[in-house]
Protein backbone atom coordinates (compact mmCIF):
# COMPACT_ATOMS: atom_id res chain seq x y z
CA UNK A 1 0.00 0.00 0.00
CA UNK A 2 1.22 3.50 -0.83
CA UNK A 3 0.40 6.91 0.55
CA UNK A 4 0.57 10.32 -1.10
CA UNK A 5 2.82 13.23 -0.17
CA UNK A 6 3.02 16.88 -1.19
CA UNK A 7 6.57 18.10 -0.57
CA UNK A 8 8.58 21.29 -0.91
CA UNK A 9 11.00 21.27 -3.87
CA UNK A 10 12.21 24.85 -3.79
CA UNK A 11 11.02 28.42 -4.08
CA UNK A 12 7.32 28.42 -5.04
CA UNK A 13 7.50 24.81 -6.14
CA UNK A 14 5.89 21.75 -4.62
CA UNK A 15 6.22 18.17 -5.77
CA UNK A 16 4.05 15.09 -5.41
CA UNK A 17 5.14 11.59 -4.49
CA UNK A 18 3.75 8.20 -3.61
CA UNK A 19 5.70 6.19 -1.05
CA UNK A 20 5.06 2.90 0.74
CA UNK A 21 3.20 3.09 4.02
CA UNK A 22 5.97 2.48 6.58
CA UNK A 23 6.14 -0.19 9.22
CA UNK A 24 5.70 1.47 12.59
CA UNK A 25 8.55 1.13 15.06
CA UNK A 26 7.92 0.37 18.73
CA UNK A 27 6.40 3.39 20.47
CA UNK A 28 5.47 5.17 17.23
CA UNK A 29 2.09 5.97 15.66
CA UNK A 30 1.06 6.27 12.02
CA UNK A 31 -1.85 8.61 11.44
CA UNK A 32 -4.22 8.99 8.50
CA UNK A 33 -4.45 12.77 8.02
CA UNK A 34 -8.06 14.00 8.14
CA UNK A 35 -7.55 17.77 8.09
CA UNK A 36 -4.48 20.02 7.93
CA UNK A 37 -3.78 23.76 8.07
CA UNK A 38 -1.45 25.92 6.06
CA UNK A 39 0.76 27.71 8.59
CA UNK A 40 2.73 30.91 8.14
CA UNK A 41 5.95 28.88 8.08
CA UNK A 42 4.59 26.84 5.15
CA UNK A 43 3.93 30.08 3.26
CA UNK A 44 7.45 31.35 4.09
CA UNK A 45 8.92 28.11 2.74
CA UNK A 46 6.87 28.46 -0.44
CA UNK A 47 8.10 32.03 -0.89
CA UNK A 48 11.67 30.97 -0.17
CA UNK A 49 11.96 33.38 2.75
CA UNK A 50 12.68 30.98 5.62
CA UNK A 51 15.77 29.26 6.94
CA UNK A 52 14.14 25.90 6.14
CA UNK A 53 13.85 26.90 2.49
CA UNK A 54 17.48 27.98 2.24
CA UNK A 55 18.79 24.51 1.37
CA UNK A 56 16.04 23.87 -1.17
CA UNK A 57 16.22 20.13 -0.59
CA UNK A 58 13.03 18.12 -0.94
CA UNK A 59 11.20 18.34 2.37
CA UNK A 60 7.86 17.32 3.80
CA UNK A 61 5.64 20.23 4.80
CA UNK A 62 2.62 20.73 7.04
CA UNK A 63 2.47 20.30 10.79
CA UNK A 64 -0.93 21.51 12.02
CA UNK A 65 -3.38 18.63 11.67
CA UNK A 66 -5.91 16.26 13.08
CA UNK A 67 -5.69 12.62 12.10
CA UNK A 68 -7.00 9.16 12.80
CA UNK A 69 -4.75 6.49 14.25
CA UNK A 70 -3.95 4.11 11.40
CA UNK A 71 -1.23 1.96 13.03
CA UNK A 72 0.07 1.73 16.58
CA UNK A 73 3.62 0.69 17.37
CA UNK A 74 4.23 -1.92 20.03
CA UNK A 75 3.70 -0.52 23.51
CA UNK A 76 1.48 2.42 22.55
CA UNK A 77 -1.65 2.20 24.67
CA UNK A 78 -2.19 5.81 25.78
CA UNK A 79 -1.65 9.34 24.50
CA UNK A 80 0.78 11.74 26.17
CA UNK A 81 -1.81 12.60 28.83
CA UNK A 82 -2.48 8.95 29.70
CA UNK A 83 -5.79 8.63 27.84
CA UNK A 84 -6.29 5.16 26.29
CA UNK A 85 -6.00 5.11 22.48
CA UNK A 86 -6.84 2.64 19.74
CA UNK A 87 -6.83 2.47 15.96
CA UNK A 88 -9.47 4.87 14.62
CA UNK A 89 -9.16 7.43 17.43
CA UNK A 90 -8.60 11.04 16.34
CA UNK A 91 -5.44 12.71 17.58
CA UNK A 92 -3.33 15.85 17.22
CA UNK A 93 0.41 16.22 17.82
CA UNK A 94 2.88 19.07 18.09
CA UNK A 95 5.29 18.95 15.16
CA UNK A 96 8.31 19.24 17.41
CA UNK A 97 9.86 16.65 19.66
CA UNK A 98 10.98 17.54 23.15
CA UNK A 99 14.10 16.03 24.65
CA UNK A 100 13.09 16.68 28.25
CA UNK A 101 16.73 17.28 29.13
CA UNK A 102 17.81 20.69 27.81
CA UNK A 103 17.53 23.87 29.91
CA UNK A 104 14.25 24.93 28.24
CA UNK A 105 12.61 21.52 28.74
CA UNK A 106 13.69 21.37 32.38
CA UNK A 107 12.00 24.77 32.82
CA UNK A 108 8.77 23.43 31.26
CA UNK A 109 9.28 25.46 28.05
CA UNK A 110 9.02 22.55 25.63
CA UNK A 111 8.28 24.96 22.78
CA UNK A 112 11.88 26.21 23.14
CA UNK A 113 13.55 22.79 23.25
CA UNK A 114 17.06 22.95 21.79
CA UNK A 115 16.55 19.57 20.09
CA UNK A 116 12.94 20.04 18.98
CA UNK A 117 13.20 20.08 15.21
CA UNK A 118 15.24 17.00 14.40
CA UNK A 119 12.45 15.49 12.27
CA UNK A 120 11.06 18.68 10.73
CA UNK A 121 11.50 19.03 6.96
CA UNK A 122 12.43 15.41 6.32
CA UNK A 123 13.06 14.19 2.78
CA UNK A 124 9.95 12.34 1.50
CA UNK A 125 12.10 9.75 -0.28
CA UNK A 126 13.66 8.69 3.04
CA UNK A 127 12.04 6.46 5.68
CA UNK A 128 9.49 6.97 7.20
CA UNK A 129 8.48 9.19 4.21
CA UNK A 130 5.53 10.86 5.96
CA UNK A 131 7.22 13.64 7.95
CA UNK A 132 4.65 16.33 7.19
CA UNK A 133 0.88 16.61 7.17
CA UNK A 134 0.49 17.67 3.53
CA UNK A 135 0.12 13.96 2.94
CA UNK A 136 -2.27 11.07 3.30
CA UNK A 137 -0.42 9.91 6.43
CA UNK A 138 1.83 11.35 9.14
CA UNK A 139 4.45 9.49 11.17
CA UNK A 140 4.62 10.25 14.90
CA UNK A 141 7.99 9.24 16.33
CA UNK A 142 8.25 7.36 19.65
CA UNK A 143 9.57 10.43 21.47
CA UNK A 144 6.90 12.74 20.01
CA UNK A 145 3.87 13.73 22.08
CA UNK A 146 0.31 13.28 20.80
CA UNK A 147 -3.15 13.86 22.24
CA UNK A 148 -6.53 12.23 21.75
CA UNK A 149 -9.23 14.58 20.43
CA UNK A 150 -12.62 14.45 22.18
CA UNK A 151 -15.51 13.31 19.98
CA UNK A 152 -17.26 16.63 20.66
CA UNK A 153 -14.52 18.62 18.87
CA UNK A 154 -14.90 18.84 15.06
CA UNK A 155 -11.82 18.35 12.85
CA UNK A 156 -11.82 21.98 11.73
CA UNK A 157 -11.40 23.15 15.34
CA UNK A 158 -9.02 20.40 16.41
CA UNK A 159 -6.54 21.24 13.68
What is each PLM-predicted segment?
Residues 41-47:
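Cytochrome P450 core scaffold surrounding the K-helix E-X-X-R motif
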Residues 6-13:
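Extracellular beta-rich ligand/substrate-recognition surface
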Residues 9, 20-21, 56-62, 125-130, ...:
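Short Gly/Pro-enriched turn/cap motifs at secondary-structure boundaries
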Residues 101-159:
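NAD(P)H dinucleotide-binding glycine-rich loop of Rossmann-like/cofactor-binding domains
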Residues 16-18, 43, 137:
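Well-ordered beta-strand positions in beta-sheet-rich domains
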Residues 22-36, 50-106, 144, 150-152:
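Glycine-rich beta-strand-centered segment in the early N-terminal region that forms part
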Residues 1-4:
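Extreme N-terminal starter segment of soluble prokaryotic enzymes
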Residues 13-16, 53, 132:
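Residues that act as N-cap/strand-start positions at coil-to-secondary-structure junctions
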Amino acid sequence: MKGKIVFFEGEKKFGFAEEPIPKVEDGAVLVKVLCTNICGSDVKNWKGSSAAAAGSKPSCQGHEFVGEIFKLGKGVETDSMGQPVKIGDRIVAPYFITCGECKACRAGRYDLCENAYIHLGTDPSEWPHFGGTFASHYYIYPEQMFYKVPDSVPNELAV
